[in-house]
């Protein structure tokens, strides 16, 4: 044992060789990684790194923002004309306190179920919006939003229990939507599209906050509860369970 130790002492060369041996055994070589990726072909990519979901939501929000600007020729008043949007008789998904996404009643399972089912409903609305825009660029953007929403659903679905895979629009809702989108009146058609895109924006913004809280974990929740309680004892963190 002493002779082996003394053999490594003469100068920095021995230390360098020892370090190289440790590094070589600690990390896999490039060949097996390539072989594994070729054989398994990463089927579902369900192991989403932390933060990837948040990046995806932000990207979708930015695409929707640009799409609405193009539809209104960058007229802010057009994008936020509430009195016009109020005339659209559609009840879009939204997150409320009972969905368990925010303090004080945080419930991850309930929240993820509501987020995923809401996204699936918005996906059906987006499918009806295909090829309903004035320009090819706008149609391309809404197709991109739909594709990214589908990917987001695929990412969240493995984490959700009791999800209804057969979600469909209610017949009355589907009829009302199609009537608005097939109107010769371009104003009503455009207003309906804006209404759906704004509803999706609001839903995604709340989803972003909820997912951010889940990924941050208890430090964020305790900070939130601490500031809300004004010095009172904060409850145990629901995200610990």
Swiss-Prot record:
The keyword Signal applies. Residues 32-51 are annotated as: Disordered. It comes from the Eukaryota. Disulfide bonds join 72-78, 101-111. GO terms for cellular component: extracellular space; interleukin-6 receptor complex. One of its GO terms (molecular function) is growth factor activity. The keyword Cell membrane does not apply. Cytokine with a wide variety of biological functions in immunity, tissue regeneration, and metabolism. Binds to IL6R, then the complex associates to the signaling subunit IL6ST/gp130 to trigger the intracellular IL6-signaling pathway. The interaction with the membrane-bound IL6R and IL6ST stimulates 'classic signaling', whereas the binding of IL6 and soluble IL6R to IL6ST stimulates 'trans-signaling'. Alternatively, 'cluster signaling' occurs when membrane-bound IL6:IL6R complexes on transmitter cells activate IL6ST receptors on neighboring receiver cells. Belongs to the IL-6 superfamily. Component of a hexamer of two molecules each of IL6, IL6R and IL6ST; first binds to IL6R to associate with the signaling subunit IL6ST. Interacts with IL6R (via the N-terminal ectodomain); this interaction may be affected by IL6R-binding with SORL1, hence decreasing IL6 cis signaling. Interacts with SORL1 (via the N-terminal ectodomain); this interaction leads to IL6 internalization and lysosomal degradation. May form a trimeric complex with the soluble SORL1 ectodomain and soluble IL6R receptor; this interaction might stabilize circulating IL6, hence promoting IL6 trans signaling. This is Interleukin-6. The gene is IL6.
